[in-house]
Amino acid sequence: MPKLQEMMTIVSQREVASNIFEMVLKGELVEEMDLPGQFLHLAVPNASMLLRRPISISSWDKVAKTCTILYRIGDETSGTYEISKLQSGAKIDVMGPLGNGFPVDEVVSTDKILIVGGGIGVPPLYELAKQLEEKNCQMTILLGFASEKVKILEKEFAELKNVSLKIATDDGSYGTKGHVGMLMEEIDFEVDALYTCGAPAMLKAVAKKYEQLERLYISMESRMACGIGACYACVEHDKEDENHALKVCEDGPVFLGKQLLL
């Protein structure tokens, strides 16, 4: 039976952008990681905070048995702030990997891939891009951030082969001034598959522009409680059945575009 919960060891933790932390974890759970886009459910090291925090997996190394997560912290009363205070060598209670990730098996070398990410929705797209790199397909990656202060993973994406990378910031402090949707308007090729994760407004814009695309994969960000589909705290509307609720933690977080009513 797969291992789904473990006291993982924190290898390192550092602030990589304004209020955004990178944590490297080590443990046996890494062996279960295969699909990019899945998430971990972390217990907060504070007995008064009962709910776990869902954080997407940015990348992993099965040889080293390590995985990397990036997350944004809240104020001093938040669970993520408590997690950010943990030091190297500490243990943290982790469930995962949970949810359904991005499918990559169907991708072939002739495919033209578009990846669109915004803010803290960018991290799960990095492992996706790493796996697509092995397919030798052409990737265009569009990333949007509020400002240069919160820009993450640019170097990591840029080092991948067959990648065209463009960045937009809302305030114009880096790259193109404006939202990432403006970069989509510059796409002049037929997209074979599109993968996206970010804020609801961005996802809605992507879904509208590419609603006819069969291979449109959308990763939803949502507040969660149980993380395993039991509590219905993270539901989205099903486009094909208005009486059916899609659970982000169990049915997602990755959905086909045609499934979601955004």
Curated annotation (Swiss-Prot):
Residues that, per the record, bind [2Fe-2S] cluster: C226, C231, C234, C249
Gene Ontology annotations of biological process type: 'de novo' UMP biosynthetic process
InterPro entries, A to Z: Cyt_c3_hydrogenase_gsu, Dihydroorotate_DH_ele_sf, Dihydroorotate_DH_Fe-S-bd, Dihydroorotate_DHASE_ETsu, FAD-bd_FR_type, FNR_nucleotide-bd, OxRdtase_FAD/NAD-bd, PyrK_electron_transfer
Cofactor annotation: [2Fe-2S] cluster; FAD
Superkingdom per UniProt: Bacteria
Listed Gene3D superfamilies: Dihydroorotate dehydrogenase, electron transfer subunit (2.10.240.10), Nucleotide-binding domain of ferredoxin-NADP reductase (FNR) module (3.40.50.80), Translation factors (2.40.30.10)
Domain FAD-binding FR-type: 3-104
Coiled coil: none
Repeat as UniProt keyword: no
Pfam families cross-referenced by the UniProt entry: DHODB_Fe-S_bind, NAD_binding_1
MF annotations from Gene Ontology: 2 iron, 2 sulfur cluster binding; electron transfer activity; flavin adenine dinucleotide binding; metal ion binding; oxidoreductase activity
Cofactor note: Binds 1 [2Fe-2S] cluster per subunit. Binds 1 FAD per subunit.
Record key words, sorted: 2Fe-2S, Electron transport, FAD, Flavoprotein, Iron, Iron-sulfur, Metal-binding, Pyrimidine biosynthesis, Transport
The protein's annotated pathway: Pyrimidine metabolism; UMP biosynthesis via de novo pathway; orotate from (S)-dihydroorotate (NAD(+) route): step 1/1
Binding residues annotated for FAD, in chain numbering: R53, P54, I55, S56, L70, Y71, R72, G79, T80
Cited function: Responsible for channeling the electrons from the oxidation of dihydroorotate from the FMN redox center in the PyrD type B subunit to the ultimate electron acceptor NAD(+).
Binding partners and assembly: Heterotetramer of 2 PyrK and 2 PyrD type B subunits.
Family according to the record: Belongs to the PyrK family.
Record-linked HAMAP family: DHODB_Fe_S_bind
Protein name per its UniProtKB record: Dihydroorotate dehydrogenase B (NAD(+)), electron transfer subunit
Organism expressing this protein natively: Lactococcus lactis subsp. lactis (strain IL1403)
